Amino acid sequence: MADEATRAAFMEIQASMIELTGKLKQVQNQMRNKEGDRKRAFLTLEELRPLPEETNTYKSIGRTFVLEPKTVLEGEQEQKLKDSEAAVASLQTSKEYLEKQVAEVENNLRELLQQEPGIAQQIMSMSM
């Protein structure tokens, strides 16, 4: 009876660990993407700023280019930069929360294995 309860607890902890790890990887990928967007916007702004105001600038829309004033493009890039920074900050808090959750689940698993050393042997025999 206790063995079944221990096994069920292990399976539950394992499922939550898999779920949390997947969510953490997803957040890390989203952070990487937003960081890339932020860098692109920053570099584009760095290239636009030294140009004279009367310079013809073009915005890419699909496969076409549309003539836009320099100030409009600068404004769009500044907005992209701000949005990306805000998204990265939000994702960072999510990442920290998920990392705490993963650590908590790891501690729960460690406690379970210390309380029931026999379950570790059963798990190892199941995986082989």
Curated annotation (Swiss-Prot):
CDD domains: Prefoldin_1. Pfam families: Prefoldin_2. Induction: Accumulates in response to cold. Its main location: cytoplasm. It is found in: Cytoplasm; Nucleus. Residues 17-37, 81-115 form a coiled coil. InterPro entries: PFD_beta-like, Prefoldin. Transmembrane segments: none annotated. One of its GO terms (molecular function) is unfolded protein binding. Keywords: Chaperone, Coiled coil, Cytoplasm, Nucleus. GO terms for cellular component: cytosol; mitochondrion; nucleus; prefoldin complex. The keyword Nucleus applies. One of its GO terms (biological process) is cellular response to gibberellin stimulus. The keyword Zinc does not apply. It comes from the Eukaryota. Belongs to the prefoldin subunit beta family. Binds specifically to cytosolic chaperonin (c-CPN) and transfers target proteins to it. Binds to nascent polypeptide chain and promotes folding in an environment in which there are many competing pathways for nonnative proteins. Together with other chaperonins, contribute to the regulation of gene expression by modulating the spliceosome function on pre-mRNA splicing post-transcriptionally by acting as a co-chaperone of Hsp90 to control levels of LSM8. Required for microtubules (MTs) organization and dynamicity. Heterohexamer of two PFD-alpha type and four PFD-beta type subunits forming prefoldin co-chaperone complex. Interacts with LSM8, a specific subunit of the LSM2-8 complex, which is a core component of the spliceosome. PANTHER family: PREFOLDIN SUBUNIT 1, PREFOLDIN SUBUNIT 1-RELATED. This is Prefoldin subunit 1. It comes from Arabidopsis thaliana. The lineage of its organism: Eukaryota, Viridiplantae, Streptophyta, Embryophyta, Tracheophyta. The gene is PFD1.
